[in-house]
Amino acid sequence: RFFLLALAGIQFTHILDFMIMMPLGPEFIKELNISTHQFGLLLSSYTFAAAIAGIFATYYVDRFERRQLLLSLYACFIVATLACGLAPNYEMLFIARAFAGAFGGILGSLVQTIVADSIPFERRGKALGTVMAAFSVSTVAGVPLGLFLANHIPALGWRAPFVFIALISTLILYLGYRNIPKISGHLDHVHEGSRFNQIFKIVTAPQHLRAFIFMAFIMITGFSVIPYIALYLTTNVGIHVSYISLIYLCGGIATLMSSRFIGHMADKYGKVRVFRVLAIISLVPLLVTTNLPVTPLWIVLINSTTFFVLVSGRMIPAMALVSQVVDNKIRGTFMSLVGSVQMLASGIASVVA
């Protein structure tokens, strides 16, 4: 129980570190005197750095014991996040975000690798649902609390959420140190040939290519919309900025309640079937979100909550499927590449959108 809780905590903080930027968009634009395009670049600095770091990680991720690597990277992530809160200007914040993305991106794929290494496929959907509920918790508690701190600690302003994330991450680092066991089964396998040839074989395997393309399209469809929800609702739909926390809160609570249920359904009825259903249904709130005129708050809440549940829900059966197409001995490398594809796709979507 504490094993999955520690992994979920790591996921929670690095997802929150990424997500907190989105609802703070209007404040960043105002306080740093930047354009919407520059804000998009600030978001993409995290994702592109995560993508590049994930590619570099393929060279070493399967050559270290999982626990030691996870905790070391998490400590570096904490330092980078604190640097975001201490950044004096846009340029330094841009650099700090890139470092946070580099460490955070590897953490995400490494956590999923550890779950896949430790939990049998038959129960993996529910386990991933537990860990990926971190996304929900970050929206339920993290994002509203981050916005509250930013609005009610004038001395820190937008810096407050990053300081908060660094502090809570330090506690989770200790929890992980005490409860995550040593995971070294993958080190028993002999890696033949040069590391480059191994990675090339992983990248070019047909089933792996299909998985990369699959994950890229999932991320593009979500992150062409998600980063700009707060800006779109306040600018085009007429929602007051004070209600943004409520929108994320409702979406997060609903996603938290649905994550384990979706994981259970994926284990019971099949990952492919559940993914197809969620993918088709999610098109409705996706299209509504991008075409909303000035609309009453209650309608916005219904649509945005449905959007969060379905768009994030797709990832649970999707990740369970993707984690199964690769052997245990190269899973860390493969999942790092999957993480890089996810971050690269979301970064491109953020810039193009």
Task: Please describe what each predicted stretch is.
Residues 21-22, 208-249:
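Extracytoplasmic gate region of multi-pass secondary transporters
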Residues 33, 65, 86-92, 238, ...:
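Helix-breaking motifs and short loop linkers at transmembrane-helix boundaries and internal kinks
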Residues 52-88:
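Conserved MFS/SLC helix-loop-helix module at the cytosolic interface between two early adjacent transmembrane helices
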Residues 96-134:
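Cytoplasmic helix-loop-helix junction between adjacent transmembrane helices
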Residues 130-178:
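Helix-loop-helix hairpin linking two adjacent transmembrane segments in secondary transporters
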Residues 181-212:
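Juxtamembrane intracellular "pre-TM" segments in multi-pass secondary transporters
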Residues 272-317:
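C-terminal transmembrane helical hairpin of 12-TM major facilitator-type secondary transporters
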Residues 329-353:
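A late C-terminal transmembrane helix in Major Facilitator Superfamily
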